[in-house]
């Protein structure tokens, strides 16, 4: 009996394994049939939509080139308008259907997949003329913002200077402010040792100036001249660039509190001048010097123009210093507006106030920005040249603007100082309250205990 059961179980297992193998074979045979059916349907659909000629049999008598030629003729006559219409829709290319051609064909032949390679080449040929721009979507690249360029300190002589005509006799006058002060005595000896000649024919009331002559000038129309002001400015008239660099190098040894080199070359003034017949004047940003004057009178007129240029470059340096100071306290109003705590000590606030007072003292008390120098009181012609140049350089307006900025900065620093004083007073009051509380507690302890 057990042997019979074992044989029945083995036979049933063999039957089940055979059935499973038959099922797998049937599934594998159906898969190629489905793929063949899908390929046939897709081929018929594309063939109907494109209206292409495909051979039914390989032995139809047509070779590869003839089939390509027939399909090309069909595409030329029937594919042009639908493709053009398709390209105009949403910037995307769509395959034209039979409805777009306005015709309905009935397929009467069976598909032949032997020409599939020819069919792929025909598709490539028909769509080779379609622009690739219709398939690639437009990309919106973000615009990169360029960093804004730092604004130059206001120089009216540069911004309002008209375009000058080209003139071979045109010469240049350049002014620099390099330090707070010069040692004119030592500078005179040092320049004389380098071959420069000092001009000693100046009036007695022009004591704070040094005038040096240059042998080789930039142009032959006027001798090269350099004016050194004790206030720390130098003005070059008709001097070569090479000579100018040499003088600036010698000047570094005799400077008191020199400025930054980049700031010196950035904040400068340059005017063109020319020799004419007639009275000297400043016309449309160009200095016109009288060619009939002798050397001493020509030096005095150049001194009047140079004095105004000296004030302009010194004021430009102080404008840059004030702008730097404003940037250092720019975060204070923003912090007060946002209700944040301002991290400034009492010593730092007093230092800021000292910087403001020093700058204000230089502009209003230690310079000739507010009044005309005494040198021009009995020289009306030179005073006219000086005032005209100062007006062209907008010195009065710039000084007024600087004083307004200084006043605003003073109000801000006073606010910070009062705020710190109030904090200190409040701290002292709390200390007094705490001490009184401790004393009261001691008294209460002595009474009750």
Swiss-Prot record:
Presence of keyword Cell membrane: no
Keyword field contains Protein biosynthesis: yes
Keywords associated with the record: Disease variant, Mitochondrion, Primary mitochondrial disease, Protein biosynthesis, Transit peptide
Effect of residue 417 to Q: In COXPD11; alters homooligomeric formation of the protein; decreases the levels of mitochondrial protein synthesis
Subcellular location: Mitochondrion
InterPro entries assigned: DUF155, RMD1/Sad1-interacting
GO BP annotations, alphabetical order: positive regulation of mitochondrial translation; translation
Major localisation: mitochondrion
GO cellular component, one term: mitochondrion
Signal peptide: none
Pfam family, one: DUF155
Transit peptide: first to last position: 1-12
Disease the record associates with this protein: Combined oxidative phosphorylation deficiency 11: A severe, multisystemic, autosomal recessive, disorder characterized by deficiencies of multiple mitochondrial respiratory enzymes leading to neonatal hypotonia and lactic acidosis. Affected individuals may have respiratory insufficiency, foot deformities, or seizures.
Listed PANTHER family: REQUIRED FOR MEIOTIC NUCLEAR DIVISION PROTEIN 1 HOMOLOG
Family assignment from sequence similarity: Belongs to the RMD1/sif2 family.
Subunit-level organization: Homooligomer.
Function (record text): Required for mitochondrial translation, possibly by coordinating the assembly or maintenance of the mitochondrial ribosome.
Name under which the protein is recorded: Required for meiotic nuclear division protein 1 homolog
Source species: Homo sapiens
Biological classification of the source: Eukaryota, Metazoa, Chordata, Craniata, Vertebrata
